[in-house]
C-alpha cells in the first residue's frame, strides 16, 4: 500500500497536470486520430516511440534519417514517448506554432475591406494559382467543412478558429 502511495505522489507532479490539460484540448475524434498516428510510428508495438521506431517509420516514407537527426527528434521529449507524452508534444506544437493571429493576418491580406470574409471564388483562384498551389479537389475538400455563407463569403476568422480549436460539435 505504501509503495502505491509513493508512486501516486510521483505521478502527480507537473507533467501529469500538463498531460491532463492536453487531453482536454482535443476532442475524442482528434485523440483517436493521434492514437492511430502513434500506433503507426510505434513499429515494435511496445507502447513507446523510440529511436528505432522513428527510423523505421521515416524509412518506410523513403527517408534515410541520420543518427543526429533521430537523436535531435528524440531529445525534444523530456522522457520516454508514450501516447500521453506524444499527445502532449503535439499539443505544445499546435499551440506554439502558427498562432491564430498569424493565420488570420495571412487571410486578411486578401480582405481589402477588413470584413473577415473573402469571396469563395476569389479564394479558390488564390489557392490554385499562388504559392503552394492547391488542386481543385483540394479546394473542394477545404470548402466541404468551411464556414461559407449563402452569398459565397468564406469566413476566415471562423475558419482560423476551427483550425486551432476544431469544429463545433454537430449532431450527425
From Swiss-Prot:
PANTHER family reported in the protein's UniProt record: MYOSIN REGULATORY LIGHT CHAIN 2 (PTHR23049)
Subunit structure comment from the entry: Myosin is a hexamer of 2 heavy chains and 4 light chains.
Residues that bear N-acetylserine: 2
Xref: InterPro entries: EF-hand-dom_pair, EF_Hand_1_Ca_BS, EF_hand_dom, Myosin_RLC
Domain EF-hand: residue ranges: 29-64, 98-133, 134-169
Stated role: Myosin regulatory subunit that plays an important role in regulation of both smooth muscle and nonmuscle cell contractile activity. Implicated in cytokinesis, receptor capping, and cell locomotion.
Any further remark recorded for this protein: This chain binds calcium.
Highest taxon, organism lineage: Eukaryota
Residues modified as Phosphothreonine: 19
Post-translational modification: Phosphorylation increases the actin-activated myosin ATPase activity and thereby regulates the contractile activity.
Species, as recorded: Gallus gallus (Chicken)
Phosphoserine sites (modified residues): 20
Signal peptide start and end residues: none
Pfam families recorded: EF-hand_7
Molecular function terms from GO: calcium ion binding; myosin heavy chain binding
Binding site for Ca(2+): 42, 44, 46, 53
Keyword Acetylation in annotation: yes
UniProt KW keywords: Acetylation, Calcium, Metal-binding, Motor protein, Muscle protein, Myosin, Phosphoprotein, Repeat
Protein name: Myosin regulatory light chain 2, smooth muscle minor isoform
Lineage of producing organism: Eukaryota, Metazoa, Chordata, Craniata, Vertebrata
Gene Ontology cellular-component annotations: cytoplasm; myosin II complex
Amino acid at each position: 500500500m505504501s509503495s502505491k502511495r509513493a508512486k501516486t505522489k510521483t505521478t502527480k507532479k507537473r507533467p501529469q497536470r500538463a498531460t491532463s490539460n492536453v487531453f482536454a484540448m482535443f476532442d475524442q475524434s482528434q485523440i483517436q486520430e493521434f492514437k492511430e498516428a502513434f500506433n503507426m510510428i510505434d513499429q515494435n508495438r511496445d507502447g513507446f516511440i523510440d529511436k528505432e521506431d522513428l527510423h523505421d517509420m521515416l524509412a518506410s516514407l523513403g527517408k534515410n534519417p541520420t543518427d543526429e537527426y533521430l537523436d535531435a527528434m528524440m531529445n525534444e521529449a523530456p522522457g520516454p514517448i508514450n501516447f500521453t507524452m506524444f499527445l502532449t508534444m503535439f499539443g505544445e506544437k499546435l499551440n506554439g506554432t502558427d498562432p491564430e493571429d498569424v493565420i488570420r493576418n495571412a487571410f486578411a491580406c486578401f480582405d481589402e475591406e477588413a470584413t473577415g470574409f473573402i469571396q469563395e471564388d476569389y479564394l479558390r483562384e488564390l489557392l490554385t494559382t499562388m504559392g503552394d498551389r492547391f488542386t481543385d479537389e483540394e479546394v473542394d475538400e477545404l470548402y466541404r467543412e468551411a464556414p461559407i455563407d449563402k452569398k459565397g463569403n468564406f469566413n476566415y476568422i471562423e475558419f482560423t478558429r476551427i483550425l486551432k480549436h476544431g469544429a463545433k460539435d454537430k449532431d450527425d
